[in-house]
Amino acid sequence: MTMSDIEDSDVENYDIAGKLALRSDDELGSDDEQNTSGEEGEEVELQDEIVSSDDDDDDGDKGKDTGKMPPTKKAKLDRKPGSDFDFASLDFEAEDNEEEDKTLSSILALSNPTAKKAKAGSFASFGFSKFLLANIAKKGYKQPTPIQRRSIPLIIDNRDVVGMARTGSGKTAAFVLPLIEKLKLRSPSGVRAVILSPSRELALQTYKQVKEFSHGTNLQSIVLIGGDSLEEDFGKMMTKPDIIVCTPGRFLHLKVEMQYDLMSVQYIVFDEADRLFEMGFAEQLNELLLALPSNRQSLLFSATLPRSLVEFAKAGLTNPVLVRLDADSKLSENLQMAYFTTKRNEREANLLYILQEVIKMPLGTPEEVKKLAAMDKRSIESDEENEEAKEQNNGKKRKYKFKKERMPSAKELPSEKSTIIFVPTKHHVEYVTSLLKDAGYLVSYIYGTLDQHARKNQLYLFRIGLTKILVVTDVAARGIDIPVLANVINFTLPGSSKIFIHRVGRTARAGNKGWAYSIVNSSELPYLLDLEIFLGKKLLLTSMHEAKCELLKKKQGGSFIPPRINYTERLVVGAIPRLDLETFQELYENLLRNNYEIKVLKDVAAKGEKLYHRTRQPASQESLKRSKEILETNSWDDQHLLFGENLEKMKDDFLAKLQNRNVKETVFELKKKGVKENDSLAEFMHRRRRQLAPIQRKAQERKELLQKERLAGLSHGIEEEVLKIDGEASGYNQNVDEAELQETFELGDEAHNKKKTFKDPQFFMSHYAPASVIQDQQLSIASSFANDAQAATFDLDNDDKLQKNKQQVMKWDKKKGKYINSMSTDKKYIISENGTKIPATFRSGKFDEWRKQRNLKPTSSLTNNETPENNKRFKHKKQSVPKLPDKYRDDYHKQKQKVEKALDSGMRVKGYNKPGMQQELKSTEQIRKARAIKEQRRAKNARPSRRK
């Protein structure tokens, strides 16, 4: 069927979302910045992106369309049965990428004539305007990523979308590009788009992309983040911008403080949606959602979302479509991981060893240290001068322009060994930063409560490559704009598998390879086993690999080749070589001994870690049981396979052979060897050995039996693992076949009420629990975001780690004369528009004071229907009092005429009164003043009144 046949056919109602739902087996794209050019000013031609491939044909074929649309299967916009609020899901059929791109271009050409000549699979095939295509080309983007290719057409078609793709797949551009395409021009009606980001850094990063893609338009966009001046934000909001990029706390504060009307919002985006709904903003988010119009378009994007998204009905989605790209592959295929076991007090030594021996991190040269100190000093001085200028200029900041270093492009590493270290609390940030600086490394640091100016400065130093290491917490690292990294180090293993994905997702982007190193102790082993199930990647201990090699030796004989260790598909666990680790432990102890400040910071971090362990979510019971079994084998802390042969173990094996010799004697027996006389000590040792022999034999048999039971309980043994074909997935993932998909989902456009099966998903109990069920349990969102924050899937811990659930303690209140709950506060609440209680601190009256100082109308008088412009041209009608005439000036008579004219018009001029203008009757204020003056004169003169 040709394109002309399609246009002439009776079937004209093409569902864009339906036709785009084609399953492709291509790998996920890299991050937003993967295709950016090295220079911002580089000119890129648009011809390659817009011109159709038909233009390259021969002249004889021009005007002749010989291509046919590939046969496609209609997409299934499915709904889960048995749910009150159904979410549609895009069912991607297995098709080649080329066919999918051609189909996408053909379908969009039907709805948008500007996309008819667009090259298949390009940004122009979406029907974007010329200015937007030019901005995309300036950024260096050539082809859309999978999440962009599948979600942008749905967004343009005004569908609510829930997008799930891993970190760095281009989610930001997926909602920013259609947003700008739909808004295009400035509108005085008010705010039309709101983008909510969970962190300040992510908001700034999104705002930067909005500004770059909207270049050439008159769209006005602002960014609202915590830490900035409220007065500046008041001024921004009063300009009625088109696009607001903000963090939820500051935006809700301004909304309540200013009583701002949001009924003009057409487009709202929840970036990193899972985190937004788990930050404790339950009441405030409900208030915000109710303040938005019902016909808005809502979009949710995140790297990790559960398969069942019914709970996101709170966000007010209408007939949403789920676009999910990483249901099976949650990590980059280029990411290699290594897990190093540690003892209680050797975590810092492990960190120093990884940096120096594994990553080969260079120490800072004297020139680099001097340059870093100079830039820090310059930043502090400019900040102080900025504060002084702000006080002198009535709150206006003075911008200082310094010569900035060249930022690397998105494809370049900030530095060759750029490494980010994740720690649990802000106390650990200060401790680890001081430790590494004292060891000679160049370090930047960021945590949640750090000043905004300091954040930008620390991130800038890392981006330009002046510092090689960045120490962060999970809260602060969310959304930090670092396109490419070489290494990620987990100082402690996170308590959630989703947090781990967000951490390690910062490396191995844009087709680059990356490493993720994690330091794990025995208490964190259950979380590692949870991660094993969640990722679908099996644990690999050194003993397991050695047993595998022995089995292969028996099978292959002389042709044995040691198997290659796959650090991408397996979780390889082991310890750092003992002798080397002891050297770095001595180095750490010397640093601690010579620097009192580090010792103090270590004590503070230790207290914070105790509270962190007390409040983090527990591991699953199954993982706790398995961790005990692994710890009993005493093989989980063998030397890591990354370091080759274990010389210490070879020495121990040799000593064990000596210990298992046939003739065993003690020193008492050796002395009396060859002497026929009976010796009491030698006889005693013989008798003792005969008594212990049965006990030792039973203990050995018990150990072997436990080992057999453990191996029998595994899903597959070492033999099965060896016989596997190389490259085959060795995890717990189970591919869902087509029959199960058709049974689970329904067509989105049809309202089917009949059940597909007799099973009730709420009560049916299967005879087995597949691994996908465990994965969904870890990905699931609790029934209530507000009430079950503890059980939420992805709960990032605060930097200072305040305890969430403290026991209620009663204390005596002297003023009230009774015992009160120590947890109770006198926080005042106000009733919002929908009747919910919100903190009264949100309504402090600062905006009213700011407005009165500037003589501005209240926001209630600037509603959408009563805008100041009102689409009319204003005429200047203000009349001012003329200047008083001066005899000694040339314009005396002219000014006198102006005064007379003003008096005739009824205006009052000081010193000039016409008949009838002066008020004859005195006011009460004039009478009071006259009496006061009279009393003063009488007291001054002190003379009695004259009597006649």
Swiss-Prot record:
The record's PROSITE patterns line, in alphabetical order, gives: DEAD_ATP_HELICASE, HELICASE_ATP_BIND_1, HELICASE_CTER, Q_MOTIF
Name the Gene Ontology biological process terms: assembly of large subunit precursor of preribosome; maturation of 5.8S rRNA from tricistronic rRNA transcript (SSU-rRNA, 5.8S rRNA, LSU-rRNA); maturation of LSU-rRNA from tricistronic rRNA transcript (SSU-rRNA, 5.8S rRNA, LSU-rRNA)
What UniProt notes about the protein's domains is: The Q motif is unique to and characteristic of the DEAD box family of RNA helicases and controls ATP binding and hydrolysis.
- Catalyzed chemical reaction(s): ATP + H2O = ADP + phosphate + H(+)
Where is the Helicase C-terminal domain positioned along the sequence? 395-552
Composition-biased stretches, type Basic and acidic residues, lie in 884-903, 922-938
Full protein name = ATP-dependent RNA helicase DBP10
Q: To which protein family does this belong?
A: Belongs to the DEAD box helicase family. DDX54/DBP10 subfamily.
Q: Where is this region: Disordered?
A: 1-80, 378-408, 849-948
Q: What does this protein do?
A: ATP-binding RNA helicase involved in the biogenesis of 60S ribosomal subunits and is required for the normal formation of 25S and 5.8S rRNAs.
A single Gene Ontology MF term assigned here is:
RNA helicase activity
Record-linked Pfam families: DBP10CT, DEAD, Helicase_C
State the span of motif (DEAD box): 271-274
Residue ranges with Basic residues bias: 395-404, 939-948
Q: Where is the composition biased (Polar residues)?
A: 856-868
- Lineage, top-rank taxon, reads Eukaryota
DNA repair in keyword set: no
EC nos: 3.6.4.13
Task: Enumerate the residues binding ATP.
Answer: 165-172
Alphabetical UniProt keywords: ATP-binding, Helicase, Hydrolase, Nucleotide-binding, Nucleus, Ribosome biogenesis, RNA-binding, rRNA processing
Q: Which Gene3D superfamilies did the record assign?
A: P-loop containing nucleotide triphosphate hydrolases
Tell me where in or outside the cell this protein is found: Nucleus, Nucleolus
**Helicase ATP-binding domain residues:** 152-323
GO cellular component terms listed in the entry, alphabetical order: cytosol; nucleolus; preribosome, large subunit precursor
